[in-house]
Amino acid sequence: MDEKEEILEIFKKSKALLSGHFLLSSGLHSDIYFEKFQVLQYPEYVQILCKRLAEKFEKEKIEVVVGPTTGGIVIAYEVAKNLKTRSIFAESEGGKRIFKRGFQLNEGERTLIVDDILTTGGSINEVVNLVKEYKGNIIGIGVLLDRSGGKVKFDYPLKALATVEAKTYEPDNCPLCEEKVPLVKPGSKKIDLL
């Protein structure tokens, strides 16, 4: 079993790979949803996934790992633990990411940005902008799963444990809406598992 298959198997075992008609946080619609919190509830899966992600950056001399709230907190902590460095997280406030709770980033600090699922890159770009404000040295970006099929690009190296192309649709051009498949906002209703 290759790494991608192993990662997707973890998502399936934890019942995190869902099928239906979903409203994503980006506002797009999709027929597949990865419910990250179904994976994050199992420490043994988080440990495996984050160890693998940390290994992709172990030669980079990372000094701090930063993740966006909410799932990114767990990912940043576990990756930092594996890299034997510190972790902090960026919270959303007023349409942008900020550091609270006394978190600081030092100028030039070698920074790894991590998150759980990459769809449009919105949360990661907000963290990139925050790290730039602090003049941190962004070494790379790591995600558990890139559901954009590699379409989302950053100015920094991106490493994903698995890349899948999950179709997304604009709400006004969604075939699932045309077929009158009920739209579900994840976390709000029981849905079918793959």
In which residue ranges do the predicted regions lie?
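PRPP-associated nucleotide enzymes
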Residues: 1-114, 118-194
